[in-house]
Amino acid sequence: MKLLNRLKVFERKYVFLRWATGAEYGKINYVGDDYVEFNIIDVDTMEFRETTIINASLILEVIFGGADISRIVAEISSMLPEA
């Protein structure tokens, strides 16, 4: 299975993404044929800082589970308005 096919499962999910020139927590917005659109989160304020388009061949690591990801999801969820 190719990396891009696997990443399509994680569209709209929070992950830790490491690529050739950086590593950040964020949300995968879209997985294209040869790139990934990634919203970077400022972990201090839990707000989206910027959107990055990353060439898929430069992606080295994607972490989609664990304590850090759970913490980010919990903090983002706590900031949602009450229904």
Features from the language model and the residues they span:
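Conserved RNA-binding domains used in RNP assembly and mRNA/RNA metabolism
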Residues: M1-A83
